[in-house]
Amino acid sequence: MRPSGRAADALRSISLTRHYTRHAEGSVLCAFGDTKVLCTASVLAKVPPHKKGSGEGWVTAEYGMLPRATHTRSDREAARGKQTGRTQEIQRLIGRAMRSVFDLAALGEYTLHLDCDVLQADGGTRTAAITGAFVAAHDAVATMLRDGLIAASPIRDHVAAVSVGMVDGVPVLDLDYAEDSNCDTDMNVVMTGSGGFVEVQGTAEGAPFSRADLDAMTRLAEAGIARLVQYQREALGLA
């Protein structure tokens, strides 16, 4: 029995609340159970140096956690003067995930800057950030289309992410903190709406996992992400 009482293949309660803040071109509060991430998308009329004059745009991301997003308070990274390696890894992952479904030429020389701020953490913050950031990005693109900044949507597909793991020899979907801190294997999977893999991050926390375990976790992630994409479509009014 999972601590939450969920079945092994069950997601937590998922919600995607659009237009959560006033100023950003796209904003979403994404909740995976008790994990809550505010995702905003800002349209910037500039591109990084490596894209200048290319006619292409860029999609990038930043990630952070509020000091009391976790059980005990942690200092703001700004107060420490630098980002942790974990933060850098996660924000690069979010950026790669978003770019995997964007036609940068269709975006023109604009940057879509995604900010993902963890308000409350209970496992799976990076997967919630990716899933919510896509919806925020979609709304930002809709704003660009409305304002005549671009002629056609640069979004080619959906993208979402979920965690899977082995807990007491059983593959489980969408781990919360209690499971994540005690699992045998922890894996994060990012996929597109059409079923393409963007990233698979898997680590054995104790004993190595088998190929059969890997296949079982991957199948579980595929099914979970298909449901997350459906949640995205419903939130965006596309279902």
Swiss-Prot record:
Instruction: Output the GO biological process annotations, alphabetical, semicolon-separated.
Output: rRNA catabolic process; rRNA processing; tRNA processing
Q: Tell me if Nucleotidyltransferase is a UniProt keyword of this record.
A: yes
What the record says about family reads: Belongs to the RNase PH family.
Indicate which residues the UniProt annotation says bind phosphate: 86, 124-126
The protein, known as: Ribonuclease PH
Q: Which HAMAP family match?
A: RNase_PH
**What job does this protein perform?**
Phosphorolytic 3'-5' exoribonuclease that plays an important role in tRNA 3'-end maturation. Removes nucleotide residues following the 3'-CCA terminus of tRNAs; can also add nucleotides to the ends of RNA molecules by using nucleoside diphosphates as substrates, but this may not be physiologically important. Probably plays a role in initiation of 16S rRNA degradation (leading to ribosome degradation) during starvation.
Tell whether rRNA processing is among the UniProt keywords: yes
Question: What InterPro entries does the record point to?
Answer: ExoRNase_PH_dom1, ExoRNase_PH_dom2, ExoRNase_PH_dom2_sf, PNPase/RNase_PH_dom_sf, Ribosomal_Su5_D2-typ_SF, RNase_PH, RNase_PH_bac-type, RNase_PH_CS
Q: Name one Pfam family in it.
A: RNase_PH_C
The species is Cupriavidus taiwanensis (strain DSM 17343 / BCRC 17206 / CCUG 44338 / CIP 107171 / LMG 19424 / R1) (Ralstonia taiwanensis (strain LMG 19424))
- Subunit details: Homohexameric ring arranged as a trimer of dimers.
Q: Name one GO molecular function term.
A: 3'-5'-RNA exonuclease activity
Listed under catalytic activity are: tRNA(n+1) + phosphate = tRNA(n) + a ribonucleoside 5'-diphosphate
Q: Which Gene3D superfamilies match?
A: GHMP Kinase, N-terminal domain
Q: Keywords, A to Z? A: Nucleotidyltransferase, RNA-binding, rRNA processing, Transferase, tRNA processing, tRNA-binding
What Enzyme Commission number(s) appear in the record?
A: 2.7.7.56
